Amino acid sequence: MYRYKITIEYLGTDLAGWQRQAGIMSVQQILEEAIYKFSGEQVVLFGSGRTDAGVHAIGQVAHFDLSKNLETHKIITAINYFARPYSVIVWNCEMAPNNFHARFSAVSRHYIYRILNRPYSSVINRDRVWWISSPLDVLAMQKAATYLLGKHDFTSFRASSCQSKSPIKTLTELNIIKEDEEIKLYLSAPSFLHHMVRNIVGSLVLVGKNVWQAEYIKELLEVKDRKAAGPTAPASGLYFVRTEY
């Protein structure tokens, strides 16, 4: 068998997320069906991260196995041809060793969360940002973010449906940058809990609205209570940027 590693970009707005689900198209299903149409082989696609419905990706990585040794540029062309009705595209393909695993070989994952912070929304960026009309205090958000860096128990930022065995994660990057009318949050970690990024963003926004002091974020880590934290930020603003191996 030959193992192929692909890098994928997609708009998650009308999709069920990465993982196969009944009744609505997922990225995994779209790509598995596209691969079958050109190869004649049923494959299982393993992704580096399982994004939720509405979440986008710039550099999602996945792998699959085929019995055929095919030219990688032909694989890209074939997948994109059969996936063309959907907002999913493969922009890189390479051979990978048989011990490579898109999920378990990863050492770091990187996300960006986009907030449009102005009085009026955007037609072009609808479903691609979180629009917040009231001004946010970016300096307060930046201060609050420093409490989350490093190794912590992130129970307060974990979805109730999270299946991870441990709430302990190590956040290696959390930068907040204001660019004109947009606020971007850059988050990196070896791995994340379910909804962890969106729950962190939801809490930091309450700091930005001056509902909470920056120091309250530190307390959230200590109380280990999801109900004490902020709301889950909308999926529309979240982008899976890349995975490092």
Curated annotation (Swiss-Prot):
- Family matches, as NCBIfam families: hisT_truA (TIGR00071)
Q: Does the keyword Isomerase apply?
A: yes
Q: How does it assemble?
A: Homodimer.
Per its UniProt record, what Pfam families does this chain match? PseudoU_synth_1
Q: What does this protein do?
A: Formation of pseudouridine at positions 38, 39 and 40 in the anticodon stem and loop of transfer RNAs.
Q: Which UniProt keywords apply?
A: Isomerase, tRNA processing
Tell me the InterPro entries matching this sequence.
Answer: PsdUridine_synth_cat_dom_sf, PsdUridine_synth_TruA, PsdUridine_synth_TruA_a/b_dom, PsdUridine_synth_TruA_C, TruA/RsuA/RluB/E/F_N
Keyword presence, Secreted: no
The record's section on CDD domains has: PseudoU_synth_EcTruA (cd02570)
- Under which EC number(s) is this enzyme classified? 5.4.99.12
Q: By what name is this protein known? A: tRNA pseudouridine synthase A
Query: PANTHER family given for it?
Result: PSEUDOURIDYLATE SYNTHASE, TRNA PSEUDOURIDINE SYNTHASE-LIKE 1
Q: Where does substrate bind?
A: Y111
Question: Which gene name belongs to this protein?
Answer: truA
Instruction: Please give the catalytic activity noted in the UniProt record.
Output: uridine(38/39/40) in tRNA = pseudouridine(38/39/40) in tRNA
Which family does the record assign?
Belongs to the tRNA pseudouridine synthase TruA family.
Q: Which residues form the active site?
A: D52
- GO annotation (BP), single: tRNA pseudouridine synthesis
